[in-house]
Amino acid sequence: MGIKFLEVIKPFCAVLPEIQKPERKIQFREKVLWTAITLFIFLVCCQIPLFGIMSSDSADPFYWMRVILASNRGTLMELGISPIVTSGLIMQLLAGAKIIEVGDTPKDRALFNGAQKLFGMIITIGQAIVYVMTGMYGDPAEMGAGICLLIIIQLFVAGLIVLLLDELLQKGYGLGSGISLFIATNICETIVWKASSPTTINTGRGTEFEGAVIALFHLLATRTDKVRALREAFYRQNLPNLMNLIATVFVFAVVIYFQGFRVDLPIKSARYRGQYSSYPIKLFYTSNIPIILQSALVSNLYVISQMLSVRFSGNFLVNLLGQWADVSGGGPARSYPVGGLCYYLSPPESMGAILEDPVHVVVYIIFMLGSCAFFSKTWIEVSGSSAKDVAKQLKEQQMVMRGHRDTSMVHELNRYIPTAAAFGGLCIGALSVLADFLGAIGSGTGILLAVTIIYQYFEIFVKEQAEVGGMGALFF
């Protein structure tokens, strides 16, 4: 059934726009150039407003997810990477549940990637329609069918651009992947802005700067009571404070520390005697994939809950899924879940909220740890990084594990890889929860994604440097 499903969608995949693989080795400086061009296009799209929208001043229902999904409200990047990640989530779950089967052949892998792209385009259209019809840009009846269709087309084209930019980097023209690049850029931009924003906001305590660092100097300069000014700068509510900034730096350091944890399995060449090496199995074996997929799951649950709340606000089942309230609190207006399933799957707003509702905290922790471990464990089966796949790669390189025959390598790798994947996912979830509770800027999930992505780029840089033999050879 699985192979038949992939064969059924094969004709549709053939007509999808595709980036061809490079016919020659792309030099590092060219990769840097293509990566910079990709990032520039993304940032430009983040600033171009959607044509035809009547209003985007209402409370933002996806405010809490925008940093993670690299989206920007009211612009071409309204959907961000959500369609790509959601399609990956769906395909992974289908493959993990054996509803579709993905073989080891390049043909099956190509069909699987094509199916993921096809679903990504379908989801883009679906999300665009939902956003327009739920009144995010104004009353659809007042805007008219023509304007509604125009907004949907703009969102679809922007979604297609994101898909192609991601594929451009994935095919080897650039560094890393588009998804990782866009997420890291968005999160780092948010952290820098929250730390140094010159925007002034009128609070009950008077006019204050949004940026935590600028606010420190402003409060010290304008307040007569310097001790109270310091206290406000470190602990002020509803705006970024210095404790948030310190928590962010602390989480950065902790994640980088854990990146170095790994188990090295001794391997040797089957052809040349005396040639020894090691195969590293990292603690974060699946890197940031679990948290990306978990974010996609939650964001889509938010979309469904918001859509139903707008239309059927008094329905018992809809309220069971999620109840929403608008919050301003000194920043942009946003919607936040205050009841139902969505409330329990979202992080507590503050330390006070943690003490007020411990059940919420317990459910949130269990959900984060469980979902990250599950996604990490199932991801290795569909991404070509399971024990069977690693054993096959080592065999192709004519390498074997010391003290083991070819036939027993899979069994030995199975002792480490699934455990590393599940435990690594669990640790990713735990670090995300810790960052949320400490109040890190950009959310725990966002910080975790930023650090792991930046570390990936550091590893790519080191690898490229080792291949060409020096820093100067990379660029000249």
UniProtKB/Swiss-Prot annotation:
Subunit structure: The SEC61 channel-forming translocon complex consists of channel-forming core components SEC61A1, SEC61B and SEC61G and different auxiliary components such as SEC62 and SEC63.
Compartments where found: Endoplasmic reticulum membrane
The name this protein goes by in its record: Protein transport protein Sec61 subunit alpha isoform 2
Membrane-protein topology: Multi-pass membrane protein
Coiled coil: none
N-terminal signal peptide: none
Transmembrane segments: 33-53, 76-96, 118-138, 145-165, 173-193, 241-261, 289-309, 354-374, 421-441, 442-462
Pfam families cross-referenced by the UniProt entry: Plug_translocon, SecY
Organism in which the protein naturally occurs: Pongo abelii (Sumatran orangutan)
Cytoplasmic face residues: 1-32, 97-117, 166-172, 262-288, 375-420, 463-476
Stated family: Belongs to the SecY/SEC61-alpha family.
InterPro entries attached to this UniProt entry: SecY/SEC61-alpha, SecY_CS, SecY_dom_sf, Translocon_Sec61/SecY_plug_dom
UniProtKB keywords: Endoplasmic reticulum, Membrane, Protein transport, Translocation, Transmembrane, Transmembrane helix, Transport
Lumenal side: 54-75, 139-144, 194-240, 310-353
GO BP annotations, alphabetical order: protein transport
